[in-house]
Amino acid sequence: MPVYSDVGPMEFSETYSQTPEFEDSEPTVTGQILLAIASLRDTDKNSIQAASTMLNSLLKKERNKLRGKVPEIIDIIYFHLRAIQEPSAREVAIGAVCLLAEKHTEETVSSLLKLSLLCDRHITQIWEALGQAKQPVRLQVLAKLLEVLKRKPCLSGERPGSDGKFADNSSLLPLAATKALCIIFRDKKCKIPMNSYYVSVIIFLVIQLHYLMNCTDSEPGQEDIIRTSNYISCTMDALKALVKRQKAPQACFTSLTGSWDLLASPENYLEGVLLLARALVKHHHGLDYAVFTKVIPLLHHGDDQQKLTAMAFFTALLSSESTYTVLQKHYILGLLKNWQADSCPTYRWLSLHGMGNVARHLQNKKELSNLLLGILPSFNDTDEKVILTAMEVINKIVTLHKNNINMNIFVKIVKQLQPFLADGRPKITCAANRLFQDMIKNLDVKEKAALQDQVLNSIVTLLLNLQDPHLTAAKSRRDSLKECKVFLGWTANDNQDSWSMICKHLVKEHPGKLRNFLDQAQDYTQSPQTYTRTAATMFIDSILEHLDSSPLQKSEVDFLRQAFSSFPSEAQRPVPVVPEPEKVRRYCADLFRCSRYFPRSCI
């Protein structure tokens, strides 16, 4: 921007007439406009009135001739606005910008954006005036700001100079547009179209957040971190101000209490997007279809940040009945299955969220079964977050449709869960046990027999891993074991030692599975964890001790005793090396107190 001296109207006129650019014999239209703007600094009210009349007349009559001159005029208005004190004169100067925007929207907005990154009260007042302008002007300005907002910023690009401006090709323009929109949204006098424009701005403000979290250098300096934090804060402010424009802002804000911090966090950004999308569907009925029309093109043609944000919106909005019915089912499931097979863990994680929302609308048993079977392979995913989400989604589906799921699907889920009941990863162990418990609770009494074998197979795993040093994991197994005891009707003998009671029940009531129980325990004697090996040895000893009360034939009892009593003691047995990673995952760190029987508190 050119540097202007602080001169009065007459001096400005003389200076202006000597400038080579304007050597015409008659004053140009631009020159007259600049002279009128400078005259607004006069303290004499008559001079101000004359300048106002002249300026408005020129802009209304000659604005078609100003193409290419708008940036210069905007610079002059901003320069003199900082010195204009008279409220009426300021109003005229700011009104001149609105008149320019009516005919030259793109040039006006672009010129103002170059002054908006380091925004002062003068620029703020100009944006507020544009937000309050008559509808055609206001809508044109908002549309142009949205167009700029859609661009990708780059913080490593050119920074604004001391005068607050930056070059035409600067990638900081989207950040300036964010600030301008924030000013307009905060002003209650500004009217915002609550339709597809509202949806578009929300989506691209959220995408701007994603850009900001990914556009810093690999080793940003302290100044870069501060600048990025400020830009993120400004974008969040704009988003909050826009959400408050809803008819029920308080209800929406209450539901979004936990999402604002998530949106500002690189690690949890997409969780925040999911919460925001759900809140929009719940509190702003009728916008869900508008969201889909904006999101779907980004799914197929957006850059990485746009696509991920669009995927989060897409999966969250599948919870809406109206939006689910608009799209064809095979299109939705096709997208989700493609994402589930993608090499990117985030894609797989989002696909599971989408499948969980699709399940809300399914009533057909076959469709539910196919969906659940499609989720089950995610239990073996390499990413922990994907595994946790798969278990959480299946839990919600089972709880919601417990009376509409085939029993064989229940059996398959519980069978696939068993290795994870004693997994070495505490979060996965807790999630697996929580799902296991809920599935047992949600099972119809008439269907219990079909699941009995799977419950029995889980008892040894749970019993031998009760003393995990991770207390939450250990507690989750104790809770699962209690549910198993209730399921099998083993609650009558609570006055007996729990370990002994369980072994007695297994021997008396399930003699045909004793070999299977002992084989399981024998596998655990190869665990790399000392206390798991100790527990396995003690379990075998306890089962063998109670064999006399078994309905088995004496020859079968003798065979079991001969086969399983020949193990060396724990002190004599070397610690084995287990080369198979799949087998190692079955074991977790367990900590047993070495006693003949475990106290009731452990069960």
Residues of each region from the PLM?
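Alpha-helical solenoid scaffolds in large eukaryotic transport, assembly, and signaling factors
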Residues: 19-25, 42-47, 53-68, 95-101, ...
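Alpha-helical repeat/alpha-solenoid scaffolds of the HEAT/ARM/MIF4G superfamily
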Residues: 182-279, 287, 292, 490-494
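Intrinsically disordered, low-complexity regions enriched in proline, serine, glycine
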Residues: 49, 63, 67-68, 90, ...
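Short coil/turn segments at helix-helix junctions and helix-capping linkers
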Residues: 20, 24, 35-49, 61-65, ...
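Hydrophobic residues within the alpha-helices of tandem HEAT/HEAT-like
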Residues: 54-62, 93-102, 126-135, 149, ...
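HEAT-repeat alpha-solenoid elements in large eukaryotic scaffold proteins
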Residues: 6-16, 45-58, 85-89, 117-126, ...
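HEAT/HEAT-like alpha-solenoid repeats
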Residues: 25-39, 65-81, 104-122, 145-150, ...
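Eukaryotic modular interaction domains in large regulatory/scaffold proteins
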Residues: 306-307, 348, 438, 501, ...
